[in-house]
């Protein structure tokens, strides 16, 4: 099996708040705005907004009512620590940083190189969505040929 992710669903506190942010973010990450869908899954008590890309579907979902007031924290068991998207170049990371500020993302760390990360040349920007969910856009140099 090839390690390829088909889709990701992230639960947000309030779709009405999150959806406008993700409507601006997802095209910056290569998702086509016209490839967006919405559904109510009554059997599982949630609504979902899904952004399509030929290689990955990314969705935001409403919380169950019983969990709606729970705090979001990436270090809780079962939580997503952060999600990283791969950029084609450092310039792409830098350009995205400007756009992230424009759409109101909370910048955690502006673009910079991380010599403590693997592989050498790791260059990334970290940011959060309106719920405080942490994301990264990273560029790493192509692997050296063996």
Language-model regions, residue ranges each:
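Core segments of cupin and vicinal oxygen chelate
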Residues: 9-58
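Short, contiguous alpha-helical
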Residues: 127-144
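Short glycine-enriched loop/turn motifs at secondary-structure junctions
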Residues: 2-4, 76-80, 119
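Long, continuous compositionally biased terminal/linker segments
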Residues: 44-88, 95
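N-terminal beta-strand motif that seeds the catalytic metal site of vicinal oxygen chelate
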Residues: 1-19, 30, 83, 141-146
């Amino acid at each position: 099996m090839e390690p390829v992710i088909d889709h990701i669903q992230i639960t947000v506190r309030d779709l009405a708040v999150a959806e406008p942010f993700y409507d601006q973010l997802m095209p910056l990450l290569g998702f086509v705005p016209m490839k967006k869908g919405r559904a109510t899954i009554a059997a599982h008590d949630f609504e979902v907004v899904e952004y399509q890309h030929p290689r990955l579907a990314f969705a935001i979902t409403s919380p169950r009512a019983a969990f709606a007031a729970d705090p979001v924290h990436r270090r809780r068991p079962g939580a997503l620590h952060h999600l990283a998207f791969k950029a084609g170049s450092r310039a792409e990371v830098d350009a995205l940083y400007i756009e992230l500020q424009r759409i109101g993302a909370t910048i955690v760390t502006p673009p910079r190189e991380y010599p403590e990360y693997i592989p050498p040349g790791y260059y990334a920007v970290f940011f959060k969505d309106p719920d405080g969910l942490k994301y990264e856009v990273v560029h790493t140099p192509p692997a050296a040929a063996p």
